[in-house]
Amino acid sequence: MRIFIALITMSFLQANILRLSPEFYDNRIPKSIYTYKETSNKIILKESTSYYKNGQMSYKVEYDSNGLNMRKTWWYNNGNKSKLVTFKDGKIDGIWTTWKYDGEKELERFYKNGLMLKERSYTK
């Protein structure tokens, strides 16, 4: 049976922020961290972050208070950004950008209210 260590950090300097890390790699790097904010009547998930075993961030989601507007970012294990996308009212809205492993911009897709309007490729 595997036992997972929970790391809980309260920071009163940041208006009642709670960070939970339910699982760790063998090298004590957290596999993920969930950041919550306590308001007067509820606890809201503000950010979820996943990590590679080397400690490099692999995925991050930033949420607003209702959870329908968010920004998602992915990274390669070398630290270069892989993808970035934003959501508004639960639908893709804005620019969905992808990069190659070497950091070169690969593609941009332009969305409004969940519908793709156009696409721009940067590959040669």
Task: Enumerate the predicted regions with their spans.
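Glycine/tyrosine- and acidic-biased, solvent-exposed loop/turn segments at the edges of beta-strands
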Residues: 14-124
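Sec-dependent N-terminal signal peptides
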Residues: 3-12
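Short loop/turn motifs at secondary-structure junctions
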Residues: 2-3, 44
